[in-house]
Amino acid sequence: MVVSADPLSSERAEMNILEINQELRSQLAESNQQFRDLKEKFLITQATAYSLANQLKKYKCEEYKDIIDSVLRDELQSMEKLAEKLRQAEELRQYKALVHSQAKELTQLREKLREGRDASRWLNKHLKTLLTPDDPDKSQGQDLREQLAEGHRLAEHLVHKLSPENDEDEDEDEDDKDEEVEKVQESPAPREVQKTEEKEVPQDSLEECAVTCSNSHNPSNSNQPHRSTKITFKEHEVDSALVVESEHPHDEEEEALNIPPENQNDHEEEEGKAPVPPRHHDKSNSYRHREVSFLALDEQKVCSAQDVARDYSNPKWDETSLGFLEKQSDLEEVKGQETVAPRLSRGPLRVDKHEIPQESLDGCCLTPSILPDLTPSYHPYWSTLYSFEDKQVSLALVDKIKKDQEEIEDQSPPCPRLSQELPEVKEQEVPEDSVNEVYLTPSVHHDVSDCHQPYSSTLSSLEDQLACSALDVASPTEAACPQGTWSGDLSHHQSEVQVSQAQLEPSTLVPSCLRLQLDQGFHCGNGLAQRGLSSTTCSFSANADSGNQWPFQELVLEPSLGMKNPPQLEDDALEGSASNTQGRQVTGRIRASLVLILKTIRRRLPFSKWRLAFRFAGPHAESAEIPNTAGRTQRMAG
């Protein structure tokens, strides 16, 4: 007997199965959630255990050593697993990138194959039409050639599409085209730059030419001479050379001055090599005479030189350099002779034009003044000698005296005379009894006569680490020179100068219009007394207004006292002359003019302040003693 299933029971069974599935799914979800929670707790616990194990290991707990090792071991294993996972993830990332690139290449290859199929299909069709001609006339001739050309083109296109280097070639072709375009665009620019440079070069050259022309020619209409100075310092020796150059728009020749006094042997070698100009040489009226005043220093001594040469009739300016370097032994030999033959040394000196040394020069600003109460019939010849110590730099500044002079027919052979204007004189009054120290200020005589004007010159030479500078002043006389011997005798003595505080100040400048005209040939009649130059002595003589002669006064330079208002140099000239004396009657006269023009607009030459003091021994003193640096004394007659 067969029992049939009840449909209600079957429905109940299906409902039970569905409920069971739902319950199981809910339980599975709960289990997954619990697993995740437990996993989180495990990770937290593992981290806590790892930290505790590290602390225990730090405190060296032997009891929990096994636990610590196990925990740390587990931690190391977990770290290794994590590192491995990271490495695998990185590799998967790389592989994924590689797969993408390969997939891209496959896509491109599929595209090429499709194009290749199309090209091959067109080629096949073309060949079929070519091989199965309908008209034999058309198969030959122009139509055949066109079909063959078309087939050749299709075959090339197919090969080009199927070649794997197609993309690379296309890229290269595009790059080449881009480069060509860039070159075409950039090519005009360099040409334009070259053209502009070619245009600029002549302009620069023209500017340079203009600069050189402006430097070589005198910009002013007054024909003011240029000056150039160069100061060289070598070890403990200082050579200071002031070279004044007078330029003309047509200047062609220039000679500079060089004074390197190192020792006597060097001077003798220079004398043997360099030509020495003659002592007595009559120069034509077309040339101005030249004068150079040198201050020679030997071993830690300062040498100051001033040179000038100017020619008014010739467009070329001749510049000569004369050097006077003399030792004490030579001076003693020269004193007994009738004429003084100072040594001459010549040497080139590189002089940079339009340059004024702005560094501090330890020098002196010495301004001569004529002794007060001088009679108009007699003016003394006097010169000063400066000695410097402690490696100080000295500069000889010469006061300008202009003179108007006519030739005297009754006396010895005439010589070219240099007539110049003489500025007015402002003399200082010096009390005889109360004043022991006075400031020397520049002063010049009032009137100028046509009679002979004597000059004096001093060549200063130093020894035992002394530096000297010579100050030469020419005093004109207002009356005719007396016939016979001179009433005043010129003796030689030496004054000591010590420089302890010589500083330059830009406010102190050399007095304007400084010129020196020096004539060593003392010619004043038949009974002219012969006077020998000495590089270490200087003398002073003067006549008072009452007719009595003043005694020789001693000139002392006090370095500790500074001149409050030193003179200033402007756009004028410093002229001087250096000449040689002859025998008893001077037959020739060498005149030289030293021109020093300093333009205050462009440059200034600073000098230190000096204070000059006179020590008067009294109006009726027979003689005065002046000690020199070595402790020796010399007497000068009153």
From Swiss-Prot:
Under Gene3D superfamilies, the record lists: 1.20.5.1700
Residue segments, region Disordered: 157-285, 562-584
Q: Which residues form a coiled coil?
A: 10-43, 69-115
User: Which keywords has UniProt assigned to this entry?
Assistant: Coiled coil, Cytoplasm, Repeat
Coiled coil: present as a keyword of the record?
yes
Coarse class of the primary localization is cytoplasm
> Compositional bias (Low complexity) at which positions?
214-226
Tissue spec: Expressed in testis.
The answer to keyword Heme applying to this record is no
From which domain of life does this come? Eukaryota
Pfam families documented for this protein = Olduvai
Q: Where is the Olduvai domain?
A: 174-261, 326-399, 400-503
**Anything further noted?**
Encoded by one of the numerous copies of NBPF genes clustered in the p36, p12 and q21 region of the chromosome 1.
Q: Which family does it belong to?
A: Belongs to the NBPF family.
Task: State the name under which the record lists this protein.
Answer: NBPF family member NBPF4
Whose protein is this, by species?
Homo sapiens (Human)
